[in-house]
C-alpha cells in the first residue's frame, strides 16, 4: 500500500556514472549499507556493501528462478539442479571429461527411457543398468571436489537454497580469496556438468522423507494450494512429488539451466571487508566471459492466469502426528509492493511477542496456547498469515474465532495510541541491528533483485514506515481483511496418504580419494596475501570492575550503535533448583503491585527494550537488551518484577493447564523426541529434559513457592556482563543504585548431569511413526579434555565428519546415497570437569538403517586415509581461524568459556600455533585410540514395525523405552 504523505524522500538516488576502471555503479545517498550496484556488459548484476567488522565476505549468487518455473511433469527440478551444481564442471570434479562424457550421455538417455516405464520389473532392470553405467562413469568422477575447492580457500557455510522464486548459492570466504572464489564460481555457472546423478537423487529423496514428518510444511503447502489454485505457488512444491523425484529428466534439467541460468537473470551479492574497485575488477575478469558472444535476451518466464478473487472463505485440513493448530492466510500483493511495508507493520501490531494485540489479549490472558501473525513475501503474490494453537479442550474453530476477533480489534482501532509508535521504533531497532550482519545485508540485496525492487525503495523503507498513522493502518485493515481467507486445520493423527517407496539397489561409487583435477591444484597453489590472525587478549579487550557490593563486572565498549546488552549471570541452574524454569515461564504472566502484566509488557516495548530469563544446566542468566538510553528504566522494571511479582492463583491454574498441553504437544514432534532420547541415552534418567517439575508437582506446588525461587535469585551473588555505549563507571553507578541495600548470599550448589560411559555395545530404541529414523552412535570412555589436544581434535573433526569434504559425508551420502544429513565428531566439553566423547549422527529412510550402521562402523573401525583431503582439512581450519574475529559481546562470552575450561587465553591461539605440526598419521592414531573398535550406544528413534529388528539384535541387546520414559511425563 502506497500511503499519501509517507514518501518524504530522505535519500537521493545517485545515477551519475562513477568511473573506477570503467565500472559504473549506482548508489543511494544516505544508505547505511553503502551498497553499490553494478552491471557487467552481459547483464550480470553485482551488489556490493563494505563492512570491515571481520576479514571475511558473505557471498550470494542468486538466480531469479525457483520451483515455480519447474516443468509440471518434473516438479522438484530447480531444487535438484541446486544439488547438482555441487558436482563439478568440465574442469573440476572429473579426472578426464573426454572419457567421462560418453557415459554421462548414456546415463541421460537411459533416464529418459526409465521415466516412461511403468512395469515394476522393467523399471528395476532399467535402474540396474543405470547403476552399472554409473559405476563406469564414476571411475572419472572426483566426488566433492567443489567442497575441496571451498576448503582450500577457507570458505565457511558452503550451502545453497531453493525457494519458489530464487535459487541461491552461498559462501562465506576470507577477504583475500575473492580471486579464487570468483574463478571457481564463474566456471561453475558456465561449465556445469551433471554427474553423480543417481546417488544425489537419493540424497534429495532423503530430504523429501524428512519433510514428510514436517506437518508445518504440509500445512503451508495446503494453504498455498487453496490461495493460488492456478499459480505454481499452489500447484507444485519446491521439493516436488514422490513420482517426479523417482522419474527425473536430465534433459529437462539441462533445458532449465540453459534458459534461466544466464547472466542477465543472475546477481552476485557480497558484503564484507573488501575494496569496491578491486572486487569489481576480479568479477569482471571471470564473469564477463559468461555468454560474452551472445546478445542479451530478456528471460521469458511462464505466464500464469490472473487470480480471481476468492468467492468464499475456504476451510480445509491436513493430518499428521504433530500437535494440532490452525493456519489462516489472506492473499497479498507481491513482495516488492509498498503494501508489503504495511503488512509487516500490521503483523507487528498483532503479534510482536511482547505487546501486540494477540500477545496481550490472547497469549497473556491464556485464551489459547500460543500463536502469531506474519507476512510471507513472494515475487508474484504474497501471504498474510495468522496461526494459533489450542489449549486443552479447545477446538480449532474456537482458536479461529479468537484470531478473527483480533482482526476485528485491528479494524476498529481497538489498540493503544502508543502501540504503533512503539512498533515503528522496535522495527527500526531490529533493522539497525541487522546491519551488523553481512548475511542480513546480502539477504536484502537478494530480495531486491529477485522481487524487482529498486534499491532506493529498499533504503527508504524505514522512512515510509515512520510516516504511518493509526488512522491509515485502520483504514487499510478494513480494506485488506474484507477479502476472503483460507483456513487450514492441522489435525492430529496418522497420515495414510504417505506412500512408502523401497530403497533402490545402489552400488557404492568409488571415491577416488587421491585423484585431483588440475583446476584444484591451481587453486590450492595460488598465492594470496595471508591474513594474520587476531586473538582475543582478555587483558586488553575486556575491562573488569566491581560493584559497590563486590559483584564482578565484565565490560566491553560498544562503539558501533546505541544498543546495549546487560546480563546477570548466576553460577547455578536447573541442577540446583528445578523450579526455576517453570517459575521463569510463569513470571511472564504476572505483574507487580504497581503494574499489571500487560502494562509491563507495553512499557518494555515502548522503551524498545526486552528481557529474558534463561535457565541452563549450571547457570542462569537474566538478560536485558535494547536502546542504551533506556537501560536504567529497563533494569528498574526487571528488578521490580523479580522482587515484587504479584502471585495470581487463577492465572497459575491456567498456566499449569497450558504447560501440560504444551508438553503433550512436544511429545508429538519427531525432532523433540530425538533430542530428548539422545539426552536420555547420554546422561541417563537424570538429565536436563527430565529434571523438571512433573505434571503432578506443577498441579500441587503453591505458585508463591515458584515465585519465591525468583525472588531469591536476585539476592544470589552473580557476575554482571555489559556490552554497550556507557562507560564502565556509569554502568556500575546504575547497577549500584538499583541494588543498593541488597544483601547478597552465595549461590546454591547443584548436582551435575553426568555423561554416562559406554562399557559395552547396546541399543536404545524409542518409538516414532515416520518413514525415517534418527540415529546417533555414542561412545564415552571418560577421556578428559586438555588444551594440548585442541588442534588435533579440530583437524580430526574437519577431516572425518564435520564438513561436506569429510569422510562421513562422502561415504554415507556421496557414494551410497544413504542420507541427506550425516556427520560425526569427537565432542569436546564446555567445562574442564566434563569428559569428551565420540558421536555420529544420521537421518535416513527406515529400510536403510542397517546399511547406515554398517557404513559408519566400517569407517570408524578403519578410518579412510587421503593425504589430499587431510591437507585441505588442515588448510580450511587454518584459514578459518586466521579470519575469525571475536568482537562485541562475543569477547565476554569467550572469556567465560575459557574460564570454564580452566584457561586464561583464547584457545584458538593454541590451535593455530599447533596446527602446522599435525600430520595425517596423528589423526589416524587418535581415531584408532579413541573411536575404533570401541563399544557404542546406538540411540535410535523410529517405527519398529518398519525396522530390521532381527539384524539390529545381532549388533547389540536392545533396550526399548517409551515416549513417557524419555520425557519423564
Residue locations for each model-derived region?
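N-terminal secretory signal peptides that target proteins for export/translocation
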Residues: 1-2
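Sec-dependent N-terminal signal peptides
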Residues: 5-14
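Proteolytic maturation boundary segments
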Residues: 18-48, 275-319, 324-325, 329, ...
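M16 family metallopeptidases and their MPP-like homologs
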Residues: 49, 54-67, 76-78, 94-187, ...
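Active-site His/Glu-centered metal-binding helix of metallohydrolases
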Residues: 77-85, 583, 796
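Short, conserved charged micro-motifs
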Residues: 178-180, 276-280, 338, 394-398, ...
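A common structural junction motif
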Residues: 187-194, 287-294, 404-415, 640-649, ...
